């Protein structure tokens, strides 16, 4: 059975047990942690409009309306997409596209050209589930298993900066597939 405990802060996770703030101890073999994240304290302290997650509200140029010329992107930015009628999720895919837009607009400004608004283009989703397994969706087509895992790894390598890093990561993956991980447990 699955025991879902909402609003039950965990104070300790040990081998085979989870202790809650109210003193309950749950014996278990598997723990799945689905906790949220908190906004960066610097972002929290900014005197600007924020959403319920603490993200700074930005306009279509990724600028903070109260501070023209000041830009917020990535996890700290609440970026509304009118086409989706929703805020964009705080994902790497969104952040990378925002960074490209900001860089392009800086270059446009240096050339005396006008800025272009940020337009998000969803490229799909890929998730590695480990050990040759994954799930994905690209252009409305869902797939899973080894093909999804291989595509995830391929995209990961392509997105790395520089050939040296790509080769190091690929070699690490090859070595890891040939040999078991060397784990050491420290007891105090």
Model-derived features: positions:
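C-terminal, flexible cofactor-proximal segment of oxidoreductases
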Residues: 104-188
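A conserved beta-strand/loop element that lines the FAD pocket in flavoprotein oxidoreductases
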Residues: 1-14
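Flavin-binding catalytic cores
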Residues: 1, 38, 97-113
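FAD-site-proximal beta/loop scaffold in flavoenzymes
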Residues: 16-19, 23-97, 104
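Conserved beta-strand scaffold positions in the cores of enzyme catalytic domains, especially
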Residues: 4, 70-72, 126
């Amino acid at each position: 059975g699955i025991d879902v405990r909402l609003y039950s802060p965990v104070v300790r996770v040990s081998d085979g047990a989870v202790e809650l703030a109210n003193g309950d101890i749950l014996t278990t073999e598997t723990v799945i942690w689905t906790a949220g994240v908190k906004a960066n304290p610097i972002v929290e302290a900014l005197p600007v409009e924020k959403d319920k997650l603490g993200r700074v509200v930005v306009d279509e140029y990724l600028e903070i309306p109260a501070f023209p010329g000041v830009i917020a992107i990535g996890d700290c930015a609440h970026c509304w997409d009118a086409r989706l009628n929703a805020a964009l999720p705080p994902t790497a895919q969104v952040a990378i596209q925002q960074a490209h837009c900001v860089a392009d607009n800086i270059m446009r400004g240096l050339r005396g050209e006008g800025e272009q608004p940020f337009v998000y283009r969803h490229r799909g989703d890929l998730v590695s589930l480990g050990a040759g397994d994954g799930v994905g969706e690209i252009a409305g087509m869902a797939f899973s298993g080894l093909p999804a895992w291989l595509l995830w790894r391929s995209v990961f390598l392509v997105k790395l900066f520089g050939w040296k890093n790509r080769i190091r990561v690929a070699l690490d993956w090859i070595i890891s597939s040939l040999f078991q991980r060397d784990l050491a447990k420290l007891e105090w």
